[in-house]
């Protein structure tokens, strides 16, 4: 039996409640990173409040889940990101977010244009920003009022898997879920 290490990073912690922001927060260690188990591609911090650093990938897939949702309520989802000054590959990258309720739920997609449109400013060393931003519009998902006794885990993600171009320098500080 092989004890080979996975190429991917699997979430190892739950979301924490932030009462000031009225949100649930997932630190990078609480997210799943495709290629996150290989330090050539990602550096996933063990320390709290430190961002995950993208070294280099052509397939960006960062996912998380949240199970404290209630039927009939709406939830806003986002990520807090920044870029290293030497980040590359994001100026024409079609970044998307997705969300669905339960394994069999319908996936909702949203293009996050602010990443490519503001890439020059963002990689200039700005403070971390929330995506989607105001120019993208909010990303919200409604949990069906009839979802009682069904799989109601909110699954969400951040993706750029379409161009095949190498991307570097993304810092993911957290993901967040807020009841609206």
Curated annotation (Swiss-Prot):
Q: Which Pfam families match?
A: PP2
Q: Where are stretches of biased composition, namely Basic and acidic residues?
A: 9-21
**UniProt superkingdom:** Eukaryota
| GO molecular function ontology, one term from the record | carbohydrate binding
Q: Where is this region: Disordered?
A: 1-21
Query: Which protein, by its recorded name, is this?
Result: Protein PHLOEM PROTEIN 2-LIKE A9
């Amino acid at each position: 039996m092989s004890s080979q290490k996975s190429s991917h990073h699997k979430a190892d912690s739950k979301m924490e409640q932030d009462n000031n922001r009225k949100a649930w927060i997932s630190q990078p260690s609480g997210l799943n990173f495709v290629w996150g188990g290989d330090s050539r591609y990602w550096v996933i911090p063990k320390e709290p409040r430190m961002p995950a650093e993208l070294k280099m990938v052509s397939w960006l897939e960062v996912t998380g889940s949240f199970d404290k949702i209630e039927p009939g309520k709406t939830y806003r989802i986002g990520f807090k990101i920044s870029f290293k000054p030497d980040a590359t590959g994001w100026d024409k990258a079609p970044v998307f977010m997705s969300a669905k309720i339960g394994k069999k739920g319908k996936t909702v997609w949203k293009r996050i244009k602010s990443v490519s449109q503001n890439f020059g400013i963002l990689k200039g060393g700005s403070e971390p920003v929330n995506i989607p931003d105001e120019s993208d519009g909010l990303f919200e998902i409604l949990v069906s009022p009839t979802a009682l006794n069904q799989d109601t885990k909110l699954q969400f993600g951040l993706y750029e898997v379409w161009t095949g171009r190498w991307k570097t320098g993304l810092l993911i500080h957290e993901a967040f879920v807020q009841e609206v």
